[in-house]
């Protein structure tokens, strides 16, 4: 299913039942939009789930700066997922599936983001992955319960992007890699751009 929009909606239902105060904004559109809206109605979470549609990248970056948490629920079919870099750079806590390509390289679980167990690619709206849903719900509930911890993770996420994954670091690492290749040495870049990521 790739994006797994059912997971945030089901998570919203779980957290609402437990008394949490939040709003879930869902951005974008696609093949599962109508199913997603139907699920929201079926679960009675219209008051906490808003469909915001598609917008320009600049507008989306502004929206990220207004939010505390970014849910990235895709499965192993996602690839790198540049939106992970973008939300971290804009000060969101990234709560991401462990199957997204960039997650092992960008996120240190509990330090600069949160990682939950990915939903199986074979799951669907009718047959959601309960283990993934419970893990996602637990991570978000922890963040909502620990505002100070959430702020620390947001700060660390932004620092990771500014210090380790910045354009300046990318240029430095590229020069280091070129030098190593020209001189027949193995690259010593362990993390960030030009690493084995």
Question: Which sequence ranges carry the predicted segments?
Answer:
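A conserved mid-protein helix/loop that constitutes part of the nucleotide-sugar donor-binding site
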Residues: 1-17, 31-38
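Nucleotide-activated donor-binding/catalytic signature segment of Leloir-type glycosyltransferases, i.e.
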Residues: 37-55
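Short alpha-helical donor nucleotide-sugar binding micro-motif in glycosyltransferases
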Residues: 54-55, 62-67, 88
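Short alpha-helical segment that forms part of, or immediately flanks, the ligand-binding pocket
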Residues: 61, 84-89, 103-105, 111
């Amino acid at each position: 299913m790739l994006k797994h929009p059912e997971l945030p909606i089901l998570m919203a239902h779980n957290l609402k039942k437990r008394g949490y105060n939040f709003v879930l904004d869902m951005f974008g559109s696609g093949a599962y939009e109508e199913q997603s809206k139907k699920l929201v109605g079926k679960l009675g979470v219209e008051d906490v789930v808003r469909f915001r549609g598609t917008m320009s990248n600049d507008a989306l970056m502004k929206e990220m700066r207004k939010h505390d948490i970014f849910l990235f629920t895709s499965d192993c079919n996602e690839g790198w997922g540049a939106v992970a870099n973008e939300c971290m750079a804009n000060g969101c806590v990234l709560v991401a599936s462990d199957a997204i390509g960039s997650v092992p390289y960008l996120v240190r679980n509990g330090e600069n983001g949160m990682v939950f167990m990915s939903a199986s690619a074979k799951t669907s709206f009718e047959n959601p992955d309960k283990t993934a849903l419970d893990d996602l719900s637990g991570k978000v509930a922890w963040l909502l319960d620990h505002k100070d911890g959430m702020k620390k993770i947001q700060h660390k996420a932004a620092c990771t992007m500014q210090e380790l994954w910045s354009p300046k670091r990318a240029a430095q690492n590229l020069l280091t890699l070129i030098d190593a290749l020209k001189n027949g040495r193995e690259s010593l870049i362990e993390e960030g751009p030009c690493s084995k990521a």
